[in-house]
Regions:
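Nucleotide-activated donor-binding/catalytic signature segment of Leloir-type glycosyltransferases, i.e.
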Residues: 208-227
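Glycosyltransferase donor-sugar binding loop
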Residues: 170, 194-209, 225
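Aromatic "clamp/platform" in nucleotide-sugar-dependent glycosyltransferases that forms part
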Residues: 247
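Short hydrophobic beta-strand element within catalytic cores of glycosyltransferases
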Residues: 264-267
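A short, active-site helix/loop in glycosyltransferases that binds the activated sugar's phosphate group
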Residues: 104-130, 138-142, 179
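Conserved acidic donor-binding segment of nucleotide-sugar-dependent glycosyltransferases
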Residues: 279-290, 297-304
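Conserved donor-binding/catalytic core segment of Leloir-type glycosyltransferases
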Residues: 160-178, 184-187
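Membrane-proximal helix-turn-helix segments that form the acceptor-binding/catalytic region
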Residues: 76, 91-111
Length: 338
């Protein structure tokens, strides 16, 4: 068995959830001694794609009569691996599949999603190919808290005070930074705490409304693009709180990494898979920005109990070896059907 693991965006986009998912898949295959390649011209038994931008490459593989697998809904915070669109109609928020993503998914032989609700959503929105739930694995050794050299990277790079608590929020630099005030209001009320908002900032650079919000934020609230993998991991290892303030479904793989880093999760209800989390057990989940702000403040003030241990136990179930075996079983079943 040899697998094509394909995700090759432009270098400026090869650093976020898509790149980390590619590394995770390759790592899982290595653990179970399964060969892989990144060269589409090689010989292989099955091809695994993860970006709706790669439809042309998928077509090349299909012409060779090779089975195709597509991973979807694992990296929705990354523009390169985003399958969903959002719009408002009559005051209601509507989630749809990108037209090119839907077209690509319906060319695949098998689609892998991280949760049951994701599978149900794809089916309800026009995907007619087989879909399996396959939760991405996590290399827990990459989040080893005893590695002080990696923890130091964040402080050396951003020159922050080690004695201050750190809150990291992941989101999008969309039109008006929807949901961002859940974080900003917490930063206003806790000037002694350092806050970082992380996301793909290309849109914000040209958007006046986003730039105004950023400009008027308190000094302890920092807005950055996606840092390199080692620095981002160092941020997580030092973070007291990991927030998802946005309304959009967020990046599943980023949530897994926050769980593996022993961050306290404080997330918006619409941003996460409901079957993965239980409020007050392995995360704090809220629908409204005011509640998210209050939860963040209460946690920083030690008024509510951490759910970190239960979150870590949950993510520990999804090892690279388990993920690799699940991938291999799906590949073999697909080849047998073909």
């Amino acid at each position: 068995m040899k697998v094509l693991v394909y995700f090759q965006p432009s270098p400026k986009h090869d650093y976020f959830e898509g790149a980390r998912m590619r590394k995770t898949i390759k790592g899982a295959l290595e653990v179970i001694n399964t060969a892989y390649t990144s060269n589409i011209l090689d010989d292989y038994d099955v091809a695994h794609f993860m970006s709706p931008d790669d439809e042309n490459k998928l077509n090349i593989v299909l012409e060779r009569k090779i089975p195709v697998v597509v991973s979807a809904l694992f990296g929705e915070a990354d523009p390169s691996t985003r399958f969903l669109n959002y719009k408002s109609k009559d005051g209601k928020r509507i989630t749809t599949i990108k037209p090119k993503a839907l077209r690509m998914l319906n060319k695949a032989d098998l689609i892998l999603v991280p949760c049951k609700t994701g599978k149900e959503f794809l089916i309800a929105n026009g995907v007619n190919k087989p879909i399996e739930v396959c939760v991405p694995g996590v290399n827990l050794s990459r989040f080893n808290f005893s590695r002080e050299d990696e923890k130091e990277l964040f402080y050396r790079y951003f020159r922050e005070d080690k004695n201050k608590k750190l809150v990291v929020a992941l989101g999008e630099y969309a039109y008006n930074l929807e949901g961002i005030h859940a974080v900003i209001n917490a930063a206003v009320k806790r000037p002694e705490v350092t806050f970082y908002y992380v996301g793909d900032e290309s849109f914000a650079l040209t958007n006046r409304r986003s730039k105004k919000i950023i400009k008027n934020s308190p000094k302890n609230m920092h807005f950055i693009g996606i840092p390199t993998d080692d620095i981002y991991r160092s941020m997580l290892l030092n973070a007291d709180v990991f927030m998802l303030p946005g309304y959009n479904y967020s990046g599943f793989i980023s949530i897994e990494e926050a769980m593996a880093s022993n961050c306290q999760l404080i997330v918006r209800k619409t941003a996460v898979c409901p079957e993965m989390f239980k409020n007050e057990k392995n995360a704090y989940i809220a629908e409204f920005s005011e509640t998210l702000t209050s939860l963040c403040l209460d946690y920083l003030d030690e008024k509510i109990k951490p759910t970190i241990d239960e979150a870590y136990r949950k993510i520990s179930l999804y090892s690279l070896e388990n993920f690799g075996n699940e991938l291999l079983n799906n590949y073999k079943a697909l080849i047998a059907r073909k």
